[in-house]
């Protein structure tokens, strides 16, 4: 456990637990543990989170991350945006925009420009990996890359309780409909 070593001290349990609270870019600075970070470290997270989706919840933050071991904690690295997740030129482009007190549209335009260069669907998977029935009907919202695996992307399931920082499904979460695999 991250915050407590004695499970009996935890507020989280089978019979009772606090309400789930989500954290995204919009309230990243309200995460109590973030106060320990320098302004530069927080800015780095915000730069990356403008391009790649960030979402965590209070259970992950309170129970799964060992804040005494950050940045070495695996759950922290899996959940929180890291500067190296973007190419240096992409990071610099977004950081430059953010430093100039931009309008929301400027931020979105730069984020979308960078996202389009990230190749979220390599090898033609938007066309080539869509399953096809015997009658030729394409099953959009599904992906069949490997013989034993089919991925299903229902429209109503396009979210997670927390976004993993290296998830290949990030196009499902950033509001660029042409990049979604959803049904």
Region roles according to the model:
Residues 2-144:
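Flexible, acidic/Gly-rich N-terminal and inter-domain linker regions that tether
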Residues 144-182:
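Canonical Radical SAM [4Fe-4S] cluster-binding loop centered on the CxxxCxxC motif
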